[in-house]
Swiss-Prot record:
Gly residues compositional bias, start-end: 374-387
Name this protein carries in UniProt: Translation initiation factor IF-2
Similarity remark: Belongs to the TRAFAC class translation factor GTPase superfamily. Classic translation factor GTPase family. IF-2 subfamily.
Keyword hit for Methyltransferase: no
InterPro entries assigned: DNA-bd_dom_put_sf, EF-G-like_DII, IF2_assoc_dom_bac, IF2_II, IF2_N, P-loop_NTPase, Small_GTP-bd, T_Tr_GTP-bd_dom
Region feature G2, mapped onto this chain: 523-527
Compartment list: Cytoplasm
Region of interest (G1), ranges: 498-505
Domain tr-type G, residue spans: 489-658
NCBIfam families listed in its UniProt record: IF-2, small_GTP
Name of the gene encoding the protein in the UniProt record: infB
C-alpha cells in the first residue's frame, strides 16, 4: 500500500513518526504533523539527505560487511584442581566485495581477495525479500493488465459515442441542405412567374430573353447547391480520417505504454529471480569462500570469451591469455594434452596458476583423503615426482543434486530390520522411525518389522514396495522333488472320523482283532493313531482320529493325509456336531466318503433316520442316486464289516493310488511326543518313497538321523514303504504335528534348512508381537479390571497339548481370562515348577507326571500340580476355578413394606416417621426406598428403628414402629417405605 502521509510512511519504515518528522526537517522538508501528506519528491529528498549524512558512496553499494558471533565453552582447572567453565566468544568480520563489471571488461580494475561468510538467517531473509518482491511484481502486473483492459473499454465507448454524434451531425446537415435547395427552387419559380406577368410590349424580345434569364437565375442556385454538397462530403471524409487517426494514435500510445510497463515488470521479475537464484546458490555452497583476484586482461574479441572473462560471484574470472591447463614450463608432458583441451573440458580445470579456487578446495575437503594426487595438477603431495607423472587425471566433478525425487522399487522380505529398510530406500533410519511414530508405533533401529508393516512404510515414503521372494534354502527342496522312479500301486490310507462315542475305535478294534478302546482313558480316543491291516483283499492303512470337539486340528490333519474317509455314525444317536465337522473336512480335502452306520444291533437303532439326516448335510447314499456308499455295521457283533472293507477297497481301485517306491521318502508327521528315555519321538506316515533306518530327515524345524524305527505294534523295522505308518527316533526336537517330512541327502543341508526355518519362525513371531502391541495396549485400557488365570500345560503328545490349550483358551471371558504361560510335550520338570513359581501359575499335566525333584520343589514353593487323563475333567476343573474368580453378583431382596402414619420433628435428630409395617418385616440393618405416589424419591439406609422408646433390631408385620432415615428429612404422611436387603450370589461361567 502506497504511503500518502507521514504516519503511514513511518509505519512502513517501522520507526516512530516523531523521528521521521525530525529527519524530514533536517532534509529541508517542512512537515508539521503526522497527518501531512508526503509526495515522492519529499521521499527522494529525505533519501538523498540520509545518504549524505551517513556517508554513502558508490563503493558502499559494492561492499557488504557481515559479522558473525560464535560462543563456545571450555573447561579449565585452576590451581586448586577445581574445574571451571569459561565462555569463549569468537567474533568474525567478513567483507564481501563485488567487482566492477565495466572495469573487469576494460581490464584496468582489480578486486582484493575477500572472505565471505554469509549467515543462514541473512540468506533466508534475502530469499524471503526476493520472493516478496516477485509477488509484488506479479500483483502489479495483474493490476496493470486490469487497468489496461479498462482503458481499452473506455476508449472503445468514447469512439462509439463520437461516431454516433458524427452520424447525427451528418443527418442534420443533410436535412438543412435539403431545406435550402427547396427554398431556392421556390424562389426561382416565383421569379419566373413575376417575369411572365410583365407588359406584352416587349413580348418578343422578352420572350427571347426569358429563357436565358431563367437559365441564368437557375444556374447559380444549382451550382451553389452542388458546391455545398461537395464541401460537405469532403468535410465528412476529413472528419472520418481525423477520427480514425486519433483513435489509431490513442491505441498505439496505449499499446506502447502497456508494452513498456510489461517490459519493466519483466525486467524487475527477472532481477528478483536472479537474486533469489544467487541466494540459493550461496546457501548451497560452502561457508568460507575465497575469491581469486583477476589479472588485467585485454578486451576479448568474441562474446563468449567476454562472458567467460567477466566472471561471476561464485567463480572468479580467468584472464583471456591464460591457458586452462597447467603451465608448460613446469609440466612439458602435460602441455600437449592441455593444448588440445576443449573449452568445456578446460572449464573443469583450476582457474589459477597452479592453485585452485575455493570450489576446488571445498571439493577436496569434502572428498575422500587419498595418498596420491587425483587433481591432475602440479601439486601432487609427497608422492609427486617423475614416476607418478601423468598417472592421475582430473576426476573432481561437481555433483549435481537430483531435482526430482527418486522413486525406488524396494523388495521387502518377510521380516526386515528398520536399519535395513532405510538402507534399501536410501534414507536415514530416523525417517523410518518417524513414519512408524506417525502410525502409532515406537520402534528402534534394530527392531524387526513384519512384511506388511514394512510395505506400508515404503509406500508412505513415496517408494514402490514389492514382496521379495524368499532367499531361502527351501527352494532347492522344491527343485529336487522330480523323481524318475517308477510309480507302483500303494495301499489306501483310510481315516475313521465321526462324533465322540459313536464307535470309531471299536470298529477298528474288530478289524484289527485288538482291544485298543479298552485301554484308553475314559473310553475315548485322545490321540491320532495309525495302523496298517493286512486283509485277504489287500493292505489298508487306518488313521483313527479323536471325535471330541477339542481335537479339531487333529481331524483336519487326518483328512489332509488320507485317501478315503470312513464316517462312523451311531444308528441310535444320528448326526451330531462333530459328524458335521468331519463331513466339512472331507469335502474341503476332496476325499470320498464311505458311511458306516454303527450300533445297528441296539434296539433303538434307526438307520433310515440317519440316512435322512446325512442327506440334509449333503451326503447322499448310492441307493438315492448319490456317490457315497452306506454300510450298516456293528462293531460288537462284526456284522457288515466285510462289506465295509470291500467298499473301501473298491473306492481305492477307482482312485488308482500310486506312488514311487525306489525314491527318497516323503511323508507327514501324524503325532509327536517327548519320551524321557528315547527323546523326541514322531509318528510318521510315509506317503511316497521308502524310509530306511539311518536316513537324514527334515520335519519342519527339526532334523536328525533316524536312529530307530518301530511299527505300530512296537517292533523294530528297517524300512517303511508308501502308506505305512512308523515311529522314528533321533530328531533334534519335537516336531509340530502336521509338518512335512523329507529325506535329505546330507545332515549339513538338513541343518541349514532347519536353522533357517527356526530363525524365520522367530522373526515372524517377534514382528507379529510388535505389530499387535499397540492394539493390545488399547484393548487393555478399555478392559479395566480383568482377572487372569495363568496355566502351564504339559501333555504326552503334541496333538493333545494343542487341543487342551485351545479348549482352555475358549473358556476366557471379558472378566476372567486364561493365560497359557507355557505349553510343551513331556514330563513336568524343575524348570516348569520354577516358571510356575515366578508366574504364580497352576501346572496341568495331561497323561504326564512330575519327577521326584519337581515334586519336592513344588511342595516347597506351594505350586499346585494337577494330573488329568481325560480332557473333559481338565476343562471342567479350570472352568470351576475361573467361576470362583468371578466377582459375585449383587441382588436386592425386598423384605417388607412400611406405611408412614405420622411425622414427628425431633430437635437435633430431624424427622421421625411413625410407621405401620404392612407387609414382611423391617431390620435395623436394612436399606430403604422412599415412595411417594408410587414414585421412588430417595434410596438410603435406616438411621434408627424404635418401638416405643426402645431400640429394636426387627419389627414384623402388624406392629408400629418409629423410623428415621440417614440424610433425609423430607418425610410426609402417606409415604411408603420399601425395605430391602442386598445379597451376593456366586456366579458361574
Amino acid at each position: 500500500m502506497a504511503s500518502n502521509n507521514v504516519a503511514q510512511f513511518a509505519a512502513e519504515l517501522k520507526m516512530p513518526a516523531g523521528v521521521l518528522l525530525e529527519q524530514l526537517q533536517a532534509a529541508g522538508v517542512t512537515k508539521a504533523s503526522e497527518d501531512d501528506s508526503l509526495s515522492e519528491t519529499d521521499k527522494a529528498r529525505l533519501l538523498d539527505h540520509l545518504r549524505k549524512s551517513h556517508g554513502s558512496t558508490d563503493a558502499d553499494k559494492r561492499k557488504i560487511t557481515l559479522t558473525k558471533r560464535h560462543t563456545s565453552e571450555i573447561k579449565q582447572s585452576d590451581a586448586t584442581g577445581k574445574a571451571r567453565t569459561i565462555q569463549v566468544e569468537v567474533r568474525k568480520k567478513r567483507t564481501f566485495v563485488r567487482r566492477d563489471e565495466t572495469s573487469a571488461e576494460n581490464g584496468d580494475a582489480s578486486n582484493h581477495v575477500a572472505e565471505a561468510e554469509v549467515d543462514d538467517l541473512e540468506l533466508q531473509r534475502r530469499e524471503e525479500e526476493a520472493r516478496h518482491e516477485a509477488e509484488l511484481l506479479e500483483k502489479q502486473a495483474q493490476e496493470l493488465k486490469a487497468r489496461q483492459e479498462q482503458l481499452e473499454r473506455e476508449e472503445a465507448e468514447r469512439q462509439a459515442r463520437e461516431a454516433a454524434a458524427e452520424v447525427e451531425r451528418r443527418r442534420a446537415e443533410e436535412e438543412a441542405a435539403k431545406k435550402r435547395a427547396a427554398a431556392a427552387a421556390e424562389a426561382a419559380a416565383r421569379e419566373q412567374q413575376t417575369q411572365a406577368s410583365k407588359p406584352a410590349q416587349a413580348a418578343q424580345p422578352a420572350a427571347a430573353k426569358a429563357e436565358p434569364v431563367a437559365a441564368k437565375a437557375a444556374e447559380p442556385v444549382v451550382a451553389r447547391q452542388s458546391e455545398q454538397d461537395d464541401e460537405r462530403a469532403a468535410a465528412e471524409r476529413a472528419a472520418q480520417r481525423e477520427a480514425a487517426k486519433k483513435a489509431e494514435d490513442a491505441a498505439r500510445q496505449a499499446a506502447e505504454k502497456a508494452r513498456a510497463e510489461q517490459e519493466e515488470i519483466a525486467k524487475r521479475r527477472a532481477a528478483a529471480e536472479a537474486e533469489a537464484r544467487a541466494i540459493r546458490e550461496m546457501m548451497n555452497t560452502p561457508r568460507k569462500a575465497q575469491v581469486k583476484a583477476p589479472e588485467p586482461a585485454p578486451k576479448p574479441a568474441e562474446p563468449a570469451k567476454a562472458a567467460e572473462a567477466k566472471g561471476t560471484l561464485h567463480k572468479p574470472a580467468r584472464p583471456a591469455g591464460e591457458a586452462p591447463a597447467r603451465p608448460a614450463a613446469k609440466k612439458p608432458a602435460a602441455a600437449a594434452p592441455a593444448a588440445t583441451t576443449t573449452p568445456s573440458a578446460g572449464d573443469k580445470k583450476k582457474p589459477g596458476g597452479g592453485k585452485g579456487g575455493w570450489q576446488d578446495d571445498a571439493a577436496k575437503r569434502r572428498g575422500i583423503k587419498t595418498r596420491g594426487d587425483t587433481s591432475g595438477g602440479v601439486d601432487r603431495g609427497w608422492r609427486g615426482g617423475p614416476k607418478g607423472r601423468g598417472k592421475h587425471q582430473d576426476q573432481n566433478t561437481t555433483f549435481q543434486a537430483p531435482t526430482e525425487p527418486i522413486v525406488r522399487e524396494v523388495h521387502v522380505p518377510e521380516t526386515i530390520t528398520v536399519a535395513d529398510l532405510a538402507h534399501k530406500m536410501a534414507v536415514k533410519a530416523s525417517e523410518v522411525i518417524k513414519s512408524m511414530m506417525k502410525l502409532g508405533q515406537m520402534v528402534t533401529i534394530n527392531q524387526m518389522l513384519d512384511q506388511e508393516t514394512a510395505m506400508i512404510i515404503v509406500e508412505e515414503l513415496g517408494h514402490h514396495a514389492v514382496a521379495a521372494k524368499l532367499d531361502d534354502p527351501e527352494a532347492m527342496l522344491v527343485e529336487g522333488e522330480v523323481s524318475d522312479a517308477e510309480s507302483l500301486p500303494r495301499p489306501p490310507v483310510v481315516t475313521v472320523m465321526g462324533h465322540v462315542d459313536h464307535g470309531k475305535t471299536s470298529l477298528l478294534d474288530y478289524i484289527r482283532r485288538a482291544k485298543v478302546a479298552a485301554g484308553e482313558a475314559g473310553g475315548i480316543t485322545q490321540h491320532i493313531g495309525a495302523y496298517h491291516v493286512e486283509t485277504p483283499r489287500g493292505v489298508i492303512t487306518f488313521l483313527d482320529t479323536p471325535g471330541h470337539e477339542a481335537f479339531t486340528a487333529m481331524r483336519a490333519r487326518g483328512a489332509k493325509a488320507t485317501d478315503i474317509v470312513i464316517l462312523v455314525v451311531a444308528a441310535d444317536d444320528g448326526v451330531m456336531p462333530q459328524t458335521k465337522e468331519a463331513i466339512a473336512h472331507a469335502k474341503a480335502g476332496g476325499v470320498p466318503l464311505v458311511v458306516a452306520i454303527n450300533k445297528i444291533d441296539k434296539p433303538d437303532a434307526n438307520p433310515e433316520r440317519v440316512k435322512q439326516e446325512l442327506v440334509a448335510e449333503g451326503v447322499v447314499p448310492e441307493e438315492y442316486g448319490g456317490d457315497s456308499p452306506f454300510v450298516s455295521v456293528s462293531a460288537k457283533t462284526g456284522a457288515g464289516i466285510d462289506d465295509l472293507l470291500e467298499n473301501v477297497l473298491l473306492q481305492a481301485e477307482v482312485l488308482e493310488l500310486k506312488a514311487p517306491v525306489e525314491a527318497p521318502a516323503k511323508g507327514l508327521v501324524i503325532e509327536a511326543k517327548l519320551d524321557k528315555g528315547k527323546g523326541p519321538v514322531a509318528t510318521i506316515l510315509v506317503q511316497s518313497g521308502t524310509l530306511n533306518r539311518g536316513d537324514v530327515v527334515l520335519a519342519g524345524s527339526a532334523y536328525g538321523r533316524v536312529r530307530a524305527m518301530l511299527d505300530e505294534t512296537g517292533k523294530p523295522t528297517k524300512s517303511a514303504g508308501p502308506s505305512i505308518p512308523v515311529e522314528i527316533q533321533g530328531l533334534s526336537e519335537v516336531p509340530q504335528a502336521g509338518e512335512e517330512v523329507i529325506v535329505m541327502p546330507d545332515e549339513r543341508k538338513a541343518r541349514e534348512v532347519a536353522l533357517f526355518r527356526q530363525g524365520k519362525f522367530r522373526d515372524v513371531k517377534l514382528a507379529k508381537q510388535q505389530a499387535a502391541k499397540l492394539e493390545n495396549m488399547l484393548e487393555q485400557m478399555g478392559e479395566g479390571e480383568v482377572q487372569y488365570m495363568p496355566l502351564i500345560v504339559k501333555a504326552d503328545v503334541q496333538g493333545s497339548q494343542e487341543a487342551l490349550v485351545q479348549s482352555l483358551l475358549k473358556l476366557s471371558t471379558d472378566e476372567v481370562r486364561v493365560q497359557i504361560v507355557h505349553g510343551a510335550v513331556g514330563g513336568i520338570s524343575e524348570s516348569d515348577v520354577n516358571l510356575a513359581t515366578a508366574s504364580k501359575a497352576v501346572i496341568i499335566g495331561f497323561n504326564t507326571r512330575a519327577d521326584a525333584q519337581a515334586r519336592k520343589l513344588a511342595e516347597a514353593n506351594g505350586v499346585d500340580i494337577r494330573y488329568y487323563n481325560i480332557i473333559y475333567d481338565a476343562v471342567d476343573d479350570v472352568k470351576a476355578a475361573m467361576s470362583g474368580m468371578l466377582a459375585p453378583e449383587k441382588r436386592e431382596v425386598v423384605t417388607g413394606t412400611v406405611e408412614v402414619r405420622q411425622v414427628f420433628k425431633v430437635p437435633k435428630i430431624g424427622a421421625v416417621a411413625g410407621c405401620m409395617v404392612t407387609d414382611g418385616f423391617v431390620k435395623r440393618s436394612s436399606s430403604v426406598r422412599v415412595l411417594r405416589n408410587n414414585v421412588v424419591i430417595f434410596t438410603g439406609e435406616l438411621d434408627s428403628l424404635k418401638r416405643f422408646k426402645d431400640d429394636v433390631k426387627e419389627v414384623r408385620q402388624g406392629f408400629e414402629c418409629g423410623m428415621s432415615i440417614k440424610n433425609f428429612n423430607d418425610i410426609v404422611e402417606g409415604d411408603q417405605f420399601e425395605v430391602f436387603e442386598v445379597t451376593e450370589v456366586a456366579r458361574s461361567l
